[in-house]
Amino acid sequence: MPPRRRTTPAAGSAALDAWRADPDGVDRATRGTAVRYTLDELGARAPGRSVEVRVPPFGAVQCVEGPRHTRGTPPNVVEADADTWLRLAAGDLTWDAALAGGRLRVSGTRAHLEALLPLVRPTTFGASASGMSR
């Protein structure tokens, strides 16, 4: 059974479009909705429970098939601030650049998600940013 989405695609898409249009000026609620939407999308694309992706304080998702944890801190964790995560999800920042810049904390052998990113199509002039197909 696929994970339950916390954000409707319409609301998430609108929030992501607003963030892409003005990352520094978007309000906290809109940023949070965009984060939850992209985390939901990651969970839908890579179902599983072997990696936990955390974007405090807005949300977390477990994803990627493999051994799952049941108690305590999971062995495979990815953590980023909201803007770093959204830039990764949007294709505006590469995994390697985020790691090299210290903007991404990764632990565990399964926690490298670069093959799953970006989650949205790059923007083109006048087009919606949040078409969630690859």
Predicted regions and their residues:
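Feature captures hydrophobic
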Residues: 1-134
